[in-house]
UniProtKB/Swiss-Prot annotation:
InterPro entries: HEV_TT_vir_Orf2/Gyrovir_Vp2_N (IPR004118). It holds the Pfam family TT_ORF2-like. The active site is at 95 (phosphocysteine intermediate). Residues 172-187 have a biased composition (Acidic residues). GO terms for molecular function: protein serine/threonine phosphatase activity; protein tyrosine phosphatase activity. This is Dual specificity protein phosphatase VP2. Keywords: Early protein, Hydrolase, Protein phosphatase. Its EC number is 3.1.3.16, 3.1.3.48. Changing residue 97 to S: 70% loss of phosphotyrosine activity. 700% increase of phosphoserine/phosphothreonine phosphatase activity. Reduced cytopathogenicity and marked inhibition of viral growth in cell culture. Residues 1-50, 165-187 are annotated as: Disordered.
């Protein structure tokens, strides 16, 4: 049965349901707009709660996303888009250069009219660093999980390599005949003496003045 009083929808055989999208898992969720149009670079776009998210961030590093997209990859792109928006807002509070992306590169890392209050800057930038680390942990976890076309990726333990590099870079001191040297190698006498009144005072004993030393 057609809408609009039983008359067929405009355009002939195309119905209103087909224009709006199928309901259910394949349709758009509440607050989401799905665009089926492909860009020249072959990535899709979604608008979720006013934030435009695409799969181009993940497609750059993993070309298989163009063939096998997963639902959580949209979540990644949405999280990245929100993070970039927060970066722009935080950058506007401490710098007037106009583009926060310039600070990502060493040759363009100069700031203009930057606030001199280090505490204020740290308070503004710290949430961005925490969110970035948290997002990276989520990405690393999902990246390590197996997929139909990829085996499980195990995390590489690097602390043993770092320890070996430190031992290789270590050079013994020549003054000690090849042994290790430090500022605390000299013998330090921690004995304050049994005749000292400090020990008696700390132990609660009555303080007694030591007898004068007789010099022969």
């Amino acid at each position: 049965m057609h809408g609009n009083g039983g008359q067929p929808a405009a355009g002939g055989s195309e119905s209103a349901l087909s224009r709006e999208g199928q309901p259910g898992p394949s349709g758009a969720a509440q607050g989401q707009v799905i665009s089926n149009e492909r860009s020249p670079r072959r990535y899709s776009t979604r608008t979720i709660n006013g934030v435009q998210a695409t799969n181009k961030f993940t497609a750059v590093g993993n070309p298989s996303l163009q063939r096998d997209p997963d639902w959580y990859r949209w979540n990644y792109s949405h999280s990245i888009a929100v993070w970039l928006r927060e970066c722009s807002r935080s950058h506007a509070k401490i710098c007037n250069c106009g583009q926060f992306r310039k600070h990502w590169f060493q040759e363009c890392a100069g700031l203009e009219d930057r606030s001199t209050q280090a505490s204020l800057e740290e308070a503004i930038l710290r949430p961005l660093r925490v969110q970035g680390k948290r997002a990276k942990r989520k990405l690393d976890y999902h990246y390590s999980q197996p997929t139909p076309n990829r085996k499980k990726v195990y995390k590489t333990v690097r602390w043993q390599d770092e320890l070996a590099d430190r031992e290789a870079d270590f050079t013994p001191s020549e003054e000690d005949g090849g042994t290790t040297s430090s500022d605390f190698d000299e013998d330090i006498n921690f004995d304050i003496g049994g005749d000292s009144g400090i020990v008696d005072e700390l132990l609660g004993r009555p303080f007694t003045t030591p007898a004068p030393v007789r010099i022969v």
